[in-house]
UniProtKB/Swiss-Prot annotation:
GO terms for molecular function: ADP binding; ATP binding; phosphoglycerate kinase activity. Keywords: ATP-binding, Cytoplasm, Glycolysis, Kinase, Nucleotide-binding, Transferase. It is found in: Cytoplasm. Its EC number is 2.7.2.3. Gene3D superfamilies: Phosphoglycerate kinase, N-terminal domain (3.40.50.1260). The gene is pgk. GO terms for cellular component: cytosol. Belongs to the phosphoglycerate kinase family. Substrate binds at residues 21-23, 36, 59-62, 112, 145. It comes from Histophilus somni (strain 2336) (Haemophilus somnus). This is Phosphoglycerate kinase. The keyword Protein biosynthesis does not apply. Monomer. ATP binds at residues 196, 313, 342-345. Pfam families: PGK (PF00162).
Amino acid sequence: MSVIKMTDLDLAGKRVFIRADLNVPVKEGKVTSDARIKATIPTLKLALEKGAKVMVTSHLGRPTEGEFKPEDSLQPVVDYLKGAGFNVRLAQDYLNGVEVNEGEIVVLENVRVNKGEKKNDPELSKKYAALCDVFVMDAFGTAHRAQASTYGVAEFAPVACAGPLLAAELEALGKALKEPQRPMLAIVGGSKVSTKLTVLDSLSKIADQLIVGGGIANTFIAAEGHNVGKSLYEADLIPEAQRLSKVTNIPVPVDVRVGTEFSETALSTEKSVADVSGEESIFDIGDKSAEQLADIIRNAKTILWNGPVGVFEFPNFRKGTEIVSNAIAEATANGAFSIAGGGDTLAAIDLFGIKDKISYISTGGGAFLEFVEGKVLPAVEILEKRANG
């Protein structure tokens, strides 16, 4: 099914309500990481170029519905946009209508302060819809939530469409999952098999090769009968790890880096996976394992990456993730299509300076994983319904 795209619409003189993801970290009234705002700026510029009367909104943090507090305000985002050269102002009371002039952007205050937002209240949804001629959903990061500003408004707005950012996410994920160039490789890291089990299941059916990292890999190591000492792993999920290993090719580390404490000053010792003692914890893969994975990565034509292979935040347990990251960048330079998503993955990409060497970096955490699992994203589903009558 297809969606209407904002890029295809005539927006001249139209009131356009953009639901963006401007949920950025703020300290002492200043934005401390601007990645999400920067990702939204091309959408705002395009709407202005098309002659629209532009309103944009987002959630920020976790406010209590019906109780506005200054720390929940989108004012720091407004200040940032002013600094970027936009004619922009904040509207706090907007549910009964707001005046928007051509050439300006009106930021509508934090949607999660509005009563009924999270429960997708129809009355609130209708109020949002009444503000606009065109609703633009451009927040992939919240597309897995059916809320008034992501789903309800799309039911009632005269026109509901996908913004450039959302459209690009869907296209990139579709390219990786629906028609991947072979061989397709999926890299899934993280602390627990239990939180990624459905992702691993779905990917085992699509990918030619699956790489697991972090605490997930420890469960697979234990499933092979090795001692994992005090490592984070899930004994009750060993049968699941064994089942998945039969379905698809999952390489288990042959060597690891261990420590006796979880800290950046802990002594890091490299050893065979068969030699881990009862007092040690596995915090990274060893050089042999990292190079084996790098070889697999370099031969892949499609790479989906979610999660590191070790505790890369600590310099003493960083090497495995660094080797894997650089191999993904190398494969991409040689023509592979790579897509990365998830907070830890993005932090690793920043740390190793490979942002421009990945084909597509997803802005969604939970939404990215749910899409990979094959779940229907409510905010996308309603756009498809509206586009197809």
